[in-house]
Amino acid sequence: MSWWSSTPSIDEQVEKATSESLPSGESDLALNLEICDLIRSKTVPAKDAMRSLKRRLLNRNPNVQLAALQLTDVCIKNGGSHFLVEIASREFVDPLMAIARNDDANPEVRQRVLQLLQQWAVAFAGQLQLQQVENAVTQLKSEGVSFPSASHDNAAVTSTFIDTKAPPEWIDSDVCMESGVAFSFLNRKHHCRNCGGVFTQACCQNYITLPHFGINVPVRVCNGCFKNLKKGKSDAPIHKPVPGATTTAPSSAPPANSAPNDDEDDIQKAIRLSLQEQESYKPPPPAAATSNDDDEDMKAAIAASLRDMENERQTGQTSASAGGLSSASTTVMAPSLTDLTATEESNINLLSLLVERLKGEPQGTILREPKIQELYDTVGNLRPKLARTMGETISKYDSLVDMHAKMTTVIRYYDALLEEKLNQAYTNRQSGGYAPQPHLSHQMTGQPPHLAPHLTGQITGQPHMGYQHTGQAPYLTGQVTGQAPYLSNQPTGHLTNHYTGSAPSAPQYGGPPAQNVYNAPSYQYSGAPEYDYASSPSAPSAPGGPSAPSAPAQPKEESAPLIEL
């Protein structure tokens, strides 16, 4: 795991070391020393540690302030010179001066601040980078702030207690400080955490812990430091600069507890493999060179299509659509010339990765790498091919969108038609099984409603009756075929009825004459069902008069005589 992913939070550590739950006047010495190791090994930036301590000093709880002052004093004595520079800055000293000037502050906290400022001023005496603490003490004394009397213990405090060893600052150079090999993008530089020198991968590939720097995890060291540390010597070897090499001022070193990072080696291997593939890769022949193969494939496809059509014609199953489908199914789909090969995709991805890595390199590094320029030229030649591929993809996308819209419309129309058919079938099913009621077709003039017939249909093999009614003297005509109708019970003779005028003569059976006689309507039956004529009602009698006795039944005849009124 890399060092930046395992960095502990300094704020959490400081907050835990200065917790309100700690008894007054006591501190967790083990946790304080652990924080000192984090600062001294540069695992956490010194400025972040200083700001975290300052936030705890500004807390309103006096116990938290006293614990923060105690932790600050321990870190000053064990944190290293880079941490002392941050402590001696105005950002940290000004809050301490504000507490010393405030008469309303907690007396114990104020007295402790004055005591520590006086001790630190004595310890930092004679160092320009730490002069701000001494100036603060002088200014407070000039303002009339009384400091506690210095004891003999404070007089014994010298600058030796701040000489705690810390990882050295890194030295920058253009060549390896051991082999003299110049650095490049492929031959990267590596710093030794013990001496701060810069070396190549071959000269700085050992890992070991550095307890004298507070580094308890394996870190990268050069070969010389590794041998000395194995022998029990913590002093860094002296590396003489290579003649002709240019060195710069020491650079700010990153945290020293970085674990082995194999990403650089993997990138170098990937670059070498990609370049080897690029050298051995042969571009495909141009499209003109493959035209013959395409012609052969097309001829074979056409011949196969013709054979299929001939076979279908012989079997009687040929059709235009079938022939089109057969020819389409036998067509060989040639690979698109605009598709990128695996090597081309690998080169594009590798160039993108290298460009991202070059952002953290010094200016001009890319100009000193001819292989990267060669890779860039190779990828640049793919731009027209990528443009054509993108154009074809966009066209295909548009056509697919159009087809999708058409298909959606067709499906919607089909669903509507299917729903209509289903509704129609459901309606027919609901009305099915019930035969339509027969209707009676009749013609009448001046007939009362109660004389309307209730029989409809056509009687096959049954007698047929026909009636006619005119405005003149009505008469009844009837012809009975087969079975005599129910009107055949009337006596044979001439019956004369008139709507106006004198009443007709009484029948020979006797009885009062009928006053009003309705003319028989004209009926026309078609498809009437069979009925039992024996139970059929007799013809209605004239209103107002007694009903005449029925005549004896007449024998069945082949044809009934015509009755005239």
UniProtKB/Swiss-Prot annotation:
Its main location: membrane. Residues 1-10, 478-505, 516-525 have a biased composition (Polar residues). GO terms for biological process: ATP export; cellular response to nitrogen starvation; microlipophagy; positive regulation of protein maturation; protein retention in Golgi apparatus; protein secretion; protein targeting to vacuole; protein transport to vacuole involved in ubiquitin-dependent protein catabolic process via the multivesicular body sorting pathway. Residues 245-260, 315-328, 534-553 have a biased composition (Low complexity). A zinc finger (FYVE-type) spans 170-230. Gene3D superfamilies: 1.20.5.1940, 1.25.40.90, 6.10.140.100, Zinc/RING finger domain, C3HC4 (zinc finger). It is found in: Endosome membrane. Residues 19-148 form the VHS domain. Residues 262-281, 293-312 form the UIM domain. Pfam families: FYVE, UIM, VHS, Vps27_GAT-like. Keywords: Endosome, Membrane, Metal-binding, Repeat, Zinc, Zinc-finger. PANTHER family: VACUOLAR PROTEIN SORTING-ASSOCIATED PROTEIN 27. Component of the ESCRT-0 complex composed of HSE1 and VPS27. The FYVE domain is involved in the binding to phosphatidylinositol 3-phosphate (PtdIns(3)P) which is required for the association to endosomal membranes. Both IUM domains are necessary for efficient binding to ubiquitin. Belongs to the VPS27 family. Component of the ESCRT-0 complex which is the sorting receptor for ubiquitinated cargo proteins at the multivesicular body (MVB) and recruits ESCRT-I to the MVB outer membrane. This is Vacuolar protein sorting-associated protein 27. It comes from Yarrowia lipolytica (strain CLIB 122 / E 150) (Yeast).
